[in-house]
Amino acid sequence: MSNKGQLLQDPFLNALRKEHVPVSIYLVNGIKLQGNIESFDQYVVLLRNTVTQMVYKHAISTVVPARPVNFHPDSESS
């Protein structure tokens, strides 16, 4: 994936991770996963609930935060 493809993904996922926002992740096959984003990279998201699951990004359809989250796509901060 190009760097441009990460301009929205990374800040959004990072804000969810840093603010410990609960999320619902819908997979392309319709399965709903819930938990908190523990970490992510170019290919996977680590989702923590009672256990930590490695979810491949190509299997994700939608990420729905449980509450609104502020993120800034133009600035990367760790």
Swiss-Prot record:
PROSITE patterns: SM. GO terms for biological process: regulation of DNA-templated transcription; regulation of RNA stability; regulation of translation, ncRNA-mediated. Disulfide bonds: none annotated. Keywords: RNA-binding, Stress response. InterPro entries: Hfq (IPR005001), LSM_dom_sf (IPR010920), Sm (IPR047575). It holds the Pfam family Hfq. GO terms for cellular component: cytosol. Residues 10-69 form the Sm domain. One of its GO terms (molecular function) is RNA binding. Homohexamer. PANTHER family: RNA-BINDING PROTEIN HFQ. RNA chaperone that binds small regulatory RNA (sRNAs) and mRNAs to facilitate mRNA translational regulation in response to envelope stress, environmental stress and changes in metabolite concentrations. Also binds with high specificity to tRNAs. NCBIfam families: Hfq, PRK00395.1. Belongs to the Hfq family. This is RNA-binding protein Hfq. It comes from Paraburkholderia phymatum (strain DSM 17167 / CIP 108236 / LMG 21445 / STM815).
